[in-house]
Amino acid sequence: ALPDLWVALRDAVLFWVDAGVRIFRVDNPHTKPLPFWAWMIADVRGKHPDVVFLSEAFTRPGMMYRLAKVGFSQSYTYFTWRETKREFIDYLTELTAGPPREFFRPNFFVNTPDINPRHLQNAPRSQFVIRAALAATLAGSWGLYSGFEIGESAPLPDSEEYADAEKYELRARDWNKAAHIGGEVARLNRARREHPALQTHLGLTFADADNDQVLVFVKATPAHDSVVAVAISLDPWHPQAANFTLDASLWRGFGLVDGEPLDAFEQDAAHAETWRGHRQYVSLDPHVRPYAIWRLAPSPGAARAAAPEPGDARHPSGAHA
């Protein structure tokens, strides 16, 4: 027989489901028995398959992955503590090219009620835009905790906690602050709506860029009917530029001869620019906009590649630098 506590907890969740709640953020699920989560999530989703369970577990990778395997729909990640270009490449490669790609659905939160990351503490507005751009374009799901959009970041001394944590007091916020990045958040979410490639963390290929302060990557759906290139500066203070090299898998996915011209439609731009060959250039100013998003498509007249021979298994897969 099932423990009475398990049934009571399941019934508490169903009460809120009946009230219209469909997303549950579960605090520290790794401190509860895994068999309970496997049973409870399966039972609830058997009745209500649209219910989402988000695992708020900052713990060892093995346990985070086990929670995903027993049924959690989405998971918190180590994105909050990834800061350098190499760290992003290594972590996203783990999530997209390793075993976790089959069962782990990351949700990139830029901050949480409990975590005020050191890279945001007393940082300029541009740093908040950078972190939002990274989360919104690298992950299929992303989130922010109230106050991020107006640059709230004052910490307790030598701590990753907020000095005036909303957990302990009611907050009255000035939503008209000049530092407000609501327009950039809306712009990023608009890009996500327009480009299915940005609605998943998969289909990711990093481009080789000659500046460690500039991260460049391409995301594509399996059919290559949605392909975007993204460049993000990791420097919130100074303009940065980079030459970057697109991977040959991009042309294979389009069915083109390698290096044929591509039309690059930058977000909100009226006209496309033509990218010829693998090597391209980008310049980013954090005081204007520290990121760029392009929709890529074959240029009119681009030469098509010959059909592959039967049994030719070459195809782009996973993330690589």
Place the predicted regions along the sequence by residue.
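Non-transmembrane alpha-helical segments in soluble domains
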Residues: 13-17, 41, 132-136, 185-189
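Active-site clefts of carbohydrate-active enzymes
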Residues: 100-125
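Active-site neighborhood of glycoside hydrolase catalytic domains
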Residues: 1-64
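Conserved, mostly hydrophobic/aromatic
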Residues: 16, 26, 53, 113, ...
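Structural preference for beta-strand elements that scaffold enzyme active sites
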Residues: 23-25, 50-54, 73-75, 105-108, ...
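Carbohydrate-interacting/catalytic domains
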Residues: 38, 46-48, 61, 65-73, ...
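Active-site beta-loop-alpha junctions enriched in small/polar residues
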Residues: 29-31, 56-60, 81, 110-112, ...
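Active-site region of glycoside hydrolase catalytic domains
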Residues: 1, 101-107, 132-140
